[in-house]
Amino acid sequence: MPKIIAYEEEARRGLERGMNQLAGAVKVTLGPKGRNVVLEKKWGVPAITNDGVSIAREIELEDPYEKIGAEMVKEVAKKTDEVAGDGTTTATVLAEALVHEGLRNVAAGANPIALKRGIELAVERVCGELANLSRELETKDQIASTASISAGGDTAIGQIIAEAMDKVGRDGVITVEESNTFGLELELTEGMRFDKGYISPYFITDQERMECVLEDPYILVANIKISLVKDLLPLLEKVMQAGRPLLVIAENVEGEALATLVVNKIRGTFRSVAVKAPGFGERRKAMLGDIAVLTGSQVISEEVGLRLENADLDLLGRARKVVVTKDDTTIIEGAGDPGRIAGRVSQIRSEIEKSDSDYDREKLQERLARLAGGVAVIKAGAATEVELKERKHRIEDAVRNAKAAVEEGIVPGGGVALLLASGAVFDGLEVAEDERTGAEMVRRALTEPLRQIAVNAGLEGGVVVEKVRNLQPGWGLDAATGEHVNMLEAGIIDPTKVTRSALQNAASIAGLFLTTEAVVAEKPEEKETAAAPAGGGGLEY
C-alpha cells in the first residue's frame, strides 16, 4: 500500500493534533467532579465511563498523522493501566503537558535529544522523591479510601474491596461478577478451589446440598487416566486399612476403576470421590503441582517415574476437609510443608514478573491466589445494563488500585504528591542548558493534574495551583467540597505505584514525540463519488 511521509515540524504537529484530540476526551474525567464520556459500540448499548484507558481505546482518528499521534498516547494509558491498574488519565494529562512544552522548545531551536535527557534525569529525581513521600497502608480505612477514589468516590465500593482484601490477603484474587440483584455482595472462598466437580453424582454425601464432603481425607494427585481397577486396587486397600476417605484428582477416572469407587461408596464400604484435573496441557501439569505442594503429596506421572500400581500412602496428600460440588472442588487446610508452599509462591511470583502476556499473567495470578491467599467474588448489580457494565468496570479498576497501594504504599492524592515532588527536580542537577530546559518542562508538567482537577471542578486552575503551593506540605484541594485539607487525613490518597507509573510512561512517550523527525503513514484511500442517476431523475413508479 502506498505511504505518505511528513518531516520535521509538520510531522510533530500532526502527531500533536492527534494527541490533543485524545487527551481532550480523556482529561475531562479527572478528579471527583470529572465528567463521564459516552462510547458508541458497534453492537449493543453505548458504554458510559470515566476510565481513561477505556476512552482512549475507542478513539480512532481519520487523518493518518493524527491517528499515529493518538495511538502513541494510547500506549501511555495502556501501559499505565497494565502496570498499576489506574492513573491512565493522569498519565495522559502529564504526557500532553510535556509534549506541548517540548514542541514549543524544539521549535525555538532546543536540541530534542538534550531535552529528552533532561526529562529522564528530572523524572528519576521525582520518582525518588515520591518514594520518600510514600507511606505504607496502615488501616483498612485507608484501603477503602484509595479504592473509593478510583471508583469515582463510591464509598460502598471502597468498603467492600477493603473487606475483601482483609479476608483474602495481599496475594488473594478478587474477581468481579455481574449480579441479578441490586447493590453489592461479597462471597469468600475458603481454601483452594478449582473448577472441576465430581465425575459421578453417586459420590454425593449431602443430598440436600448436592455435594460430597470428606473429612481428613487422603488425596491422590495423578497426571494420568485411571481406568483399570488393578492399577488402583493396591492403593485403595492401603487407604481402607488406614480408615480414611480418598479424593482422587486425575486426568480422568473411568471404566472399572470408576465403577469400583462408586460401588464401594454406595455400599458404605469405602468413601471416596473422583474429580478431573483442572486445566489442559502444561497448565494442568502446573496446577496439579500446586495441589501437590499444598496437600503434601506427589504427582503420580510416568514422566517422573511414578506408577499408580506401586504408589504408597507416602505419596498421598492430606487436608482437613474437602468439599466437591458438581462444578468445583475446594480443598481446605492442605497439609503441605509451609516451606515448600512458600517456595512455590516465590516461583509463581517470579513467573508473573517475567511474563509478557496478559492472559498468562492472569492465570498465574489465579494460581498464586489459590496457594497463598484466597478468592473473593464481588457481585455487582444495577438497574440497567449500561449502568451495570460501568459499575463493574469501576470496581475492577478500584481493586487494582487498592492492590497497587498495598504493594508500594500511598502518597497524598489530588495531584499534591506530584506538586510536592516537583521541588526535587533540580536537587543536585548540574547539566547543560537544553537538558536543564527539559528538567524545567517536567517541573511545570507536574502541576497539570492538580490544575485539571480544579478546572473540572469549575475552579480557576492557575489560582488553585499557587494556593496549594503555599499551603503546608501534604495539604491540597478537596475538589468535592472546594476546601483545602490535609490530604492523608482526609483520605484523599493515591497509590505511589500509580503516580510513579503515570509519570514514567508519560515521560517516555514525550521523549519519542520530541525526537521524531519523520512520520511514515499509510496513504488514505480516496472515497469514490457516487455516480449520478441516469435519465431525467424523475420519480419511478
UniProtKB/Swiss-Prot annotation:
It is an enzyme of class 5 (isomerase). Together with its co-chaperonin GroES, plays an essential role in assisting protein folding. The GroEL-GroES system forms a nano-cage that allows encapsulation of the non-native substrate proteins and provides a physical environment optimized to promote and accelerate protein folding. Disulfide bonds: none annotated. This is Chaperonin GroEL 2. Keywords: ATP-binding, Chaperone, Cytoplasm, Isomerase, Nucleotide-binding. Belongs to the chaperonin (HSP60) family. ATP binds at T29, L30, G31, P32, D86, G87, T88, T89, T90, G414, D478, A479, A480, D494. GO terms for cellular component: cytoplasm. It catalyses: ATP + H2O + a folded polypeptide = ADP + phosphate + an unfolded polypeptide.
